[in-house]
Amino acid sequence: MTRMKHILPVLAILAALVSCHERPAVLRDTIPYVKQLAVDTTGTFQLVSTYRTTGTKGSIAVIGEPEVAVQLAAVLRQADQVDNIDGLPKPDRLPDFAGESFDILLDEYNAPYLRMAASSPDSLTEVAVRNAVIAVDSVAYSNALDPRSRLAKNRAKVFVLANSLLAEYGQFDIDTLFKMAGREAVILTPVEAMLEEAAKSGYKSVAVWAPAEARSAYENAAKALQPQLDVTVVSTMGNGLLRPAFRDMLRIYRTLKPGSNLDAVLLDSFTANLEELSAEKEHIHRQITEEDMAFDRILMPHFRFIEPNAAMTGALYRLLREKNLFTHDIAYPTVRYYQTEENRDGEYVPVEVSAAYLSAHQKSEPYVPDID
């Protein structure tokens, strides 16, 4: 009987790997942490096993580094781009996510993710899984070191991973863990959201301006989900000014794809200044220099920038409608903020944070996007 208890989780792992049909990328193994959870069917695995995605109750968990997660939360809370009755793209003076509860998990403890992805990708994957697990817990704390400071918390019905690196280092393993427990994890990433936006716009050729560490996330997702798109990932140094950096990106694209045109550039940044980028695009269009003329030939007349705030807002709305997860309550969205911390046992727990903490991580008013 003991031997069977250890064999069954292994079989569950294999079944989960095969059943991840939504992203038919290269079959790969999950990290040791997830396998460990599968063998120990108490505690964390039991928590995941009791998770339910049916019905409309539960929160939308936004998981990521503090500055980005705070900004995305503000964008989602303020969004009014569609008619809540028929879903058509027209404002109706009612928040798109009316009645929804957002739980924002601010992972300052493990930020920046880019450094972790470069030095220890498996560690970043484990971080993503741990954060997903605490998102489905019904308990939070006011003090991570005091187990008596328990607070009630919503269990997540949707996971919004607010970083492209979490799409590469985490999404697969979160999905695998939940499938091993016989559950479905509803996950949204900026990678899939922006590629979906490009595809539904009818675009054929796009560049993704992203760090080298995020390259495989976009390439794998494009092959699996949007194979009709010609996707080229371009990385620049990222230490200079934005407008010259955009020109550097175009120079690299010309080298990688000589003679090709661009329908759009997908921005792997929640905080990029779209006004500056649009101004540089218009400057190029005036064709003052030979390089301007060369760049202008690359950019299609309908060229635009696709950024994750707008793409994820639209994708989240469509996802909730598709899976019938809207609460349908007539009320303003509620937002609660939690910081990821370790307790005395080294476990991740969500700690509710104050408005003072939030203002320290929101450096400017968030850009509120329009959705085509």
Regions of interest found by a model, annotated:
Residues 21-372:
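Non-catalytic structural scaffold of enzyme domains
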Residues 11-14, 331:
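Generic detection of intrinsically disordered/low-complexity segments and helix-coil linkers/edges
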Residues 17-19:
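C-terminal motif of bacterial Sec signal peptides marking the signal peptidase cleavage site
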Residues 4-12:
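Sec-dependent signal peptide recognition
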